Every structure is written in C-alpha cells, then in structure tokens.
C-alpha cells in the first residue's frame, strides 16, 4: 500500500511537483520463477503481497491478475502482427514478466491547496503496455496530444490500453508512450481504477527493432526500478 502524498509520478519525467493525491494497493508477480539469483530482482519484484483481511479479496485479486496476464500476452501478439513481426516475436521477452497490478483510489477533491498538485502527475508508463479499468462515470484522466490535454472518459465495459516506454523503445518511437495524468480540480468526486502494468522479464534486454534506432537499449527490471524509485516522496 502506498498512501496519499507519498508518490509524485511527474518525477519519473524529471519534473518536480507536489506529491500526488492518490493511494494504491499494489501487487506483483504471483510466483517466483526458479533460479532467481539477482538480489535486486528478488527484493523489488517478488516480495509477498500483504493482503487485507477482507473476505474474498485475495481470491479476487489473484484471479484478476491471472486474467490480465493472459490478456496482456494476447495483446502483445496483436502488437507483433501490427508491427509486421513474427506473431510470437515478443514471447521470448515475457517468459516471467514482472507485471504489477494497482488498485488506485483518488479521493474527492474539496480543496486543492498546492499549485500543480494533481491526483496523478503527468507521466508515461514504464513497461510494454497498461490495461486500465476505470470506474464507470469517473473523471480526471487526461492524455497529452498535439500540444493539448484531452479528457479520456471511460467507456462502459471497455479497457483503456496504454503504450508504455519499452514499447516506444522497441518501435523507435513509431508508437509513442502516452503522457497522461489525473487532474485535481475543486469538488471532483472520488475516482477508482484498476491498472495492470505489463512488464517484460527482469533481465530482458529491450532494444529498437527497426532501423535507425533513436534510443539506447535498457534492461526491463532495472529500468522499472529506477523509474519507480524516482517517484518516492
């Protein structure tokens, strides 16, 4: 669990802001793969999730996480086909993904006291893709496109799929990691959402697939850890 005013997501982009007005319950991979020798990987990705003592919560969480793993792998297959690659091109990078599930609570905003304080500061997601399930009727999510912030209202019975930093790197910015935020305006209602952040294997080397690479290769796990730690407030 990460409480309000403990994380500033804009810091992952090198932007200094007040901490975010949100809280989250977080869980990582359900199983530890055999042969994990990297101490950083073990400590950062594979610590047991401390579930609250609420009847059915743990079972529902684990079930949802597993379904998201399946869906994310299917989406990665669709991505490969869309990019003109072999159907299962990305499979070798996601044998033991270090994906995270976050249940996000953005409390009501009666007062916004600090300038540029948002419920989630402007940031991009760090992995390959994100599967977001917002509560129906929720407000506040915005993406930055063509120099403007645009609202992203939820659509009934639909996920929002977001491109992450590693997919941008793979595609040499052919597909762009979406800059987004959750704004805080006076008298906004509570916002709830579930976000599944699909992340390739800890030691997967991510490098541009196509010609004229614009970005240097990175290791999936260390990149994720560096970004995550940069947001701690």
Regions found by a protein language model. Give the residues of each.
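Peripheral, non-catalytic segments flanking oxidoreductase cores
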Residues: 1-233
């Amino acid at each position: 669990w990460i409480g309000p005013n403990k994380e500033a997501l804009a810091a992952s982009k090198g932007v200094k802001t007040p901490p975010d007005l949100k809280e989250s319950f977080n869980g990582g991979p359900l199983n530890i793969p055999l042969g994990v020798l990297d101490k950083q990987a073990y400590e950062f990705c594979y610590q047991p999730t401390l579930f609250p003592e609420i009847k059915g919560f743990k079972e529902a969480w684990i079930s949802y996480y597993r379904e998201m793993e399946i869906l994310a792998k299917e989406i990665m297959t669709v991505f490969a086909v869309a990019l003109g690659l072999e159907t299962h091109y990305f499979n070798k990078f996601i044998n033991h993904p270090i994906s995270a599930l976050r249940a996000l609570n953005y409390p009501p905003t009666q007062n916004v006291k600090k300038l540029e304080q948002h419920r989630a500061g402007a940031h991009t997601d760090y992995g390959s893709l994100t599967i977001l399930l917002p509560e129906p009727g929720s407000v506040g999510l915005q993406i930055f496109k063509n120099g403007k912030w645009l609202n992203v209202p939820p659509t009934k019975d639909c996920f929002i799929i977001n491109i992450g930093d590693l997919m941008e790197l793979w595609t040499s910015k052919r597909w762009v990691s979406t800059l987004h935020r959750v704004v805080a305006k006076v008298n906004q209602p509570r916002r709830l959402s579930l976000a599944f952040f699909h992340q390739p294997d800890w030691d997967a080397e991510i490098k541009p697939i196509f010609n004229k690479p614009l970005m240097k290769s990175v290791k999936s796990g260390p990149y994720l850890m560096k970004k995550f730690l940069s947001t701690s407030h």
